[in-house]
C-alpha cells in the first residue's frame, strides 16, 4: 500500500496521526507492506511495521502534466512560475509565444522539464495550500520511483487527496480516500470552499 498522510506519531497535532499509526500497524499485522509518505519526517517515527518516506527528501525529476497542473490551479491559490522560459526574449514576446502555443491545441506536447526538491513544514500554517499542491508533485514522483511495488493508494483526509490523485494518474493503481472528517464537520456552515472542492475532487477520483 502506498499511503499518504500529513502526520505520524510522535509528531501529531490531533487524531489524524494516531489513526494513521493504528491503521498501518493493523495492516502490517495482516501481512500488508505499507509505504507512508508524509510532508516532513523527523527520523524518530516508529518504522518497525511501516516504511516512512520524507517528502522533503524526494527529488522530483520529470515532466509536468499540463492538464493536471491546470486543474490544481483552479482549486489552489499559490504563485506558480513556469520553467519553459526562453533566453533573450522580452516578457511580452514570451506571453505571445505561450498564448500561441496554447491556442495551437498542442498543449499535450507542453512538458516543462524540472528538477526540484521541496522543503515542507508539515504544519497547518498560512502556506498550507501551497504545501498541499507541492506535496502532490512529490507524490507523483514517489509513485514513479515505486513503480510495481504497490497495489493500492490510500490518502488520508483532504490534505493528501491531490497527492493520491497524482499518484493514481502516474501509476494507474486504484485510489482509496479516507475521510476522517468533512469540512462541514469541522466548520459547520462556514466552510472553506477550497477545502470542500479538494474533498469533492478526492471522492470523485476514488475507486
Annotate each predicted stretch with a short phrase.
Residues 153-154, 204-207:
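A short beta-strand/loop micro-motif in the catalytic core of glycosyltransferases
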Amino acid at each position: 500500500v502506498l499511503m499518504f498522510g500529513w502526520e505520524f506519531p510522535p509528531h501529531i497535532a490531533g487524531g489524524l496521526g494516531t489513526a494513521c499509526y493504528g491503521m498501518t500497524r493493523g495492516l502490517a499485522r495482516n501481512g500488508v507492506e505499507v509505504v507512508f509518505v508524509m510532508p516532513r519526517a523527523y527520523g524518530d517515527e516508529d518504522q518497525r511495521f511501516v516504511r516512512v518516506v520524507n517528502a522533503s527528501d524526494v527529488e522530483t525529476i520529470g515532466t509536468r502534466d499540463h492538464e493536471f497542473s491546470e486543474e490544481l490551479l483552479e482549486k489552489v491559490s499559490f504563485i506558480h512560475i513556469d520553467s519553459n522560459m526562453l533566453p533573450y526574449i522580452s516578457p511580452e514576446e514570451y506571453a505571445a509565444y505561450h498564448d500561441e502555443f496554447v491556442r495551437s491545441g498542442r498543449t499535450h506536447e507542453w512538458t516543462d522539464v524540472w528538477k526540484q526538491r521541496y522543503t515542507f513544514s508539515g504544519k497547518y500554517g498560512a502556506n498550507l495550500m501551497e504545501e498541499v499542491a507541492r506535496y502532490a508533485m512529490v507524490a507523483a514522483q514517489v509513485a514513479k520511483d515505486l513503480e510495481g511495488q504497490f497495489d493500492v493508494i490510500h490518502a488520508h483526509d483532504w490534505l493528501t487527496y491531490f497527492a493520491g490523485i497524482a499518484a493514481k494518474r502516474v501509476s494507474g493503481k486504484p485510489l482509496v480516500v479516507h475521510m476522517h472528517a468533512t469540512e462541514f464537520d469541522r466548520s459547520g456552515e462556514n466552510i472553506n470552499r477550497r477545502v470542500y472542492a479538494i474533498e469533492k475532487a478526492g471522492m470523485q477520483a476514488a475507486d
